[in-house]
């Protein structure tokens, strides 16, 4: 997969930093409409120290956060939203279908389904290969810093 936005370019768009920046690169982007990002899940992730020490599994809430970050990139790349913040305002219909473990490549896709002014909603999926790990609907608001 081609890299459209590198890790350093992502950091220019969203404010998240280690250990909470959960996307490594963007591979597809249609500003304001859809975005796909990649997270290479390493055994060195700080959350694996406690979740779970004997059986490392990426917490579902962090998969959802990674999806929200991909959605934020899609919306904040729009010229009128540059320099603003994307706030995660809700989650609906969330389902976790399979575990994400060290060594996995997590493909995170978000497609906006409704955007009205600074508020919107999108459908999101996280996959490891062809296997669905998580699906949900995420809501957001774009605000001034």
UniProtKB/Swiss-Prot annotation:
Keywords: Cytoplasm, Lipid A biosynthesis, Lipid biosynthesis, Lipid metabolism, Lyase. Its main location: cytoplasm. GO terms for biological process: fatty acid biosynthetic process; lipid A biosynthetic process. InterPro entries: FabA_FabZ (IPR013114), FabZ (IPR010084), HotDog_dom_sf (IPR029069). It is an enzyme of class 4 (lyase). One of its GO terms (cellular component) is membrane. The active site is at residue 51. Signal peptide: none annotated. GO terms for molecular function: (3R)-hydroxyacyl-[acyl-carrier-protein] dehydratase activity. It catalyses: a (3R)-hydroxyacyl-[ACP] = a (2E)-enoyl-[ACP] + H2O. It is found in: Cytoplasm. Its EC number is 4.2.1.59. Involved in unsaturated fatty acids biosynthesis. Catalyzes the dehydration of short chain beta-hydroxyacyl-ACPs and long chain saturated and unsaturated beta-hydroxyacyl-ACPs. Belongs to the thioester dehydratase family. FabZ subfamily. This is 3-hydroxyacyl-[acyl-carrier-protein] dehydratase FabZ. It comes from Macrococcus caseolyticus (strain JCSC5402).
């Amino acid at each position: 997969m081609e890299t459209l936005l590198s890790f350093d370019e992502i950091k220019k768009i969203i404010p998240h930093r280690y250990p909470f920046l959960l996307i490594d690169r963007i591979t597809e982007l249609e500003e304001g409409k859809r975005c796909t990002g990649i997270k290479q899940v390493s055994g060195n992730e700080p959350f694996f120290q406690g979740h779970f020490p004997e059986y490392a599994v990426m917490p579902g809430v962090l998969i959802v956060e990674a999806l929200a970050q991909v959605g934020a990139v899609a919306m904040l790349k729009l010229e009128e939203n540059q320099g603003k913040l994307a706030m995660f305002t809700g989650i609906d219909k969330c389902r976790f279908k399979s575990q994400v473990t060290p060594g996995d490549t997590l493909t995170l896709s978000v497609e906006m389904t409704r955007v009205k002014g600074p508020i919107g909603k999108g459908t999101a999926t996280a996959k490891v290969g062809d296997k669905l790990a998580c699906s949900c609907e995420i809501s957001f608001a774009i605000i001034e810093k």
